[in-house]
Amino acid sequence: MVAKGKKASADAVYAKKTTRSANPFDNSTAQSSKRGNPFDVHVNKEKFKILGRICKHDRGMPGVSRAKALQKRAQTLGQQFAVKHKTNRFKDNRIGKHLSGDQLTESVMNARYLAEKMSQVRSNQKAEKFNLNDDELLTHRGQTLEEIEQYRDERSDDEELDDEALDADFTAAAHFGGEGDSAQDRQAAIDEMIVEQKRRKNEIAKEKDEVYDLTEKLDANYKLLLPLVAKVTKDEQDAKPPPDAYDKLLKEMIFEPRGSVADKLINPDELAKQEAARLEKLENERLRRMRADGEEDEEASVAKPKHRSADDLDDGYFLAGEDDEGDDTLAYDLDGNLGTHLNGKKEAVLKGDENEDDDDKEGEEEEEEDSDEESDSEVDNLSDLKESESESEPEEAPKASKKKAKKSADTIPASLDTSIPFTIKMPKTYEDFTELLSKHATAQKAIIIERIIKCNHPKLEGVNRENVVKLYSFLLQYLKDLFEDASEQDIREHFQLLSKLMPYLYELTQLNPERMSNTLLEVIKEKYEEFRKNHKMYPSLDTLVYFKLVANLYSTSDFRHPVVTPCFIFIQHVLSRSRVRTRQEISMGLFLVTVVLEFVSQSKRLVPAVFNFLQGIVHMSIPKRDVEQLEITPPFERDGPLSKLLALPANTESTKLEPQQLQPTDLVTQTITPDFKVRALDTSLLLIKEALQLVEEHVGACYLAQPFLALLSRLPLESYPEHVHQHHKDATELAEKLAAQKMKPLAPAEKKPKALRLLEPRFEAVYDDKRRPKMSKAKEERAKLLHKIKREKKGAIREIRRDTSFVQMLRLKQTLQSDKERHEKVKRIYQEASVQQGELNELSRAKKKKKF
């Protein structure tokens, strides 16, 4: 129910809908300013309707656009045209107008004054060009020069004032008796005057001495004061800020020496061709010298003149060298004796034989000295692997004489052939390769390998590229044969050969990395299969040499490597499974530990087998009773004779041994000696220190260092020399330092806020009916840019034309306005003149009336 006197909501809505106003203009809406006049709209019709084309100029309002353009030009060009040639605005163009009062230095004031005078001269150049009456007052800091100048006559301190000696008081007292009651004697007055004069002279001399001393002191410190006096000026009173990094770098670049012009870099292909051509040329010369072909012809051609005329004076007769045998021309010799050439030749031959005998004796002595020096330097000179040997041979070969070659052939054994060819063909079989190397010494084997590589370089034309792969396989097999059955006498020589061949193995690896790596990897796989058959025995020595090759030829810091990673696993299996019972096995284990530490020197990885092996070596160096056991991990034994294999007996005196490293003979010797025990423990201590330094930054370094402390504390150092004590102290201190470190508590890793997913916009080419030629991307961009420039240029020309018409219209309006004002002035002048003429006529008529 609805309350009485109230209408329902439906009735109210119905009444509102049906209510209409009586005024017909109440429902009409006022025309807004945005709607515009429909007659101002201009429609641009298209001939064809094309799908996909968006036309931006289908309709427009030219009247509104024209009005806006005129309004914009009136606000810009109109205002500029209105104030043209008008100077009703003050502009401060003075120098240093932004500086405050403290910053206005004397140089700024002088520059401002000079600029003002120059502007005045330019503005009134014709009027004041020869004006000498310049009535301007010169000022300085607000004061005129007349106020500043006071015409003082200040005398210097050095000038003596003689007139002060006879002042008025002295004259009155000396000549007139003075004004005092007691009269002085004349002699007393003169004495007093002399004393006073001496006192003043002494004071002046003292002052001069002080000034002289100060001057000498300043002269002595002149060099210290010179930078301050020379650099500090009135403009630089304020302290300059220190030069920043950019200024320092700029000065370094200014005074940096310029690079000198270098030769053009040679292409590797051209370099290989040049090297092959050089070796071929040297080989041809060597063969020619060996056969002695063409030497007599060359000497005869040099000595014998090609042509002798009838007027020849024989000036070069005795300078031509050897002459023809049948030449018996009568001539004077150098001593002025008359004779034939045959007599002089016989004497020269006799003298030459004596000289040759002396030279042979001297040559024999020199060769004996050279052979001694070469034998001494073969062991020491191991670093120069490539350049010294390859370059010295070609230089020495041309200088060798026949007799010296014969003498050297007698002194050197017949099994070693010193004549190395410069061009060597690739051996077809491994037997030929070993036969080629067996004829030469260790130092010459590296030269042979170098020349084989250069003569069979893959970049040369007509060379089989498989030759370098075959040479690499031959070298690996040759190293295997050398080290597999090495003895104590030749093991050192084999390692020297390995160090000399290492650069050439690296060069071969770089020529074809994939093939060479696969070849070496197959050899290592074969060695690993042999090791798995009897994993309790250490592999042969050639396997260890292959590991050393891998360390020198490849990057061992990679996380995964096709050659290094298998070697890594192989070494860990050897160290953790093979038994340690002899001197050879201990030396091999320490050699493998050194190689592994070289592997992880950059990556600092953790290798548990290395730490276990080093703990085992220290464990075997501790003397133990039969019932005593120490915890150790296999392959080392807790008790028994092998658990104290490296322990020194109590009665052994080895404290005087000098520090030595492990020798190459240790790798092929089985018996254990006291000096080897000392060297093994000393090497182990050094390796423990190096291994702990590598894992120093690891989280669990404390757990790796704790087992070493218990073993190092049990070592009896009384029987060991001093250097072992020092190495034991260093290793113990480092282990205690790492064992004292505390591990950080585990904490969840900090998660970075997840970035919002960014979607790349997908651009779609808009189709239009315009056919364009196919162009590259760069040409297409250039064409678009040229088209845009053309459109902008047309628009700029159109705007300039409209601006010109607008300015012409303003000038026309200004001209019309001035003409209108002039016409009004002329009209007003005529009007005033006509009024004046009327009054004048009226006066003249009045005068005529008075006359009559």
From Swiss-Prot:
UniProt subcellular location: Nucleus, Nucleolus
Cellular compartments per GO CC: Noc4p-Nop14p complex; nucleolus; small-subunit processome
Coiled-coil zones: 190-221, 774-851
GO molecular function ontology, one term from the record: snoRNA binding
Compositional bias segments (type: Acidic residues): 354-381
Keyword set, alphabetical order: Coiled coil, Nucleus, Ribosome biogenesis, rRNA processing
Extent of Polar residues compositional bias: 20-35
Keyword Nucleus: yes
Biased segments, Basic and acidic residues type: 344-353
Residues covered by region (Disordered): 1-40, 288-324, 338-410
GO biological process: maturation of SSU-rRNA; ribosomal small subunit biogenesis; rRNA processing
Family assignment from sequence similarity: Belongs to the NOP14 family.
Its job: Involved in nucleolar processing of pre-18S ribosomal RNA. Has a role in the nuclear export of 40S pre-ribosomal subunit to the cytoplasm.
Subunit structure: Component of the ribosomal small subunit (SSU) processome.
Protein name: Nucleolar protein 14 homolog
Organism from which the protein derives: Drosophila melanogaster (Fruit fly)
Gene transcribed to yield this protein: l(3)07882
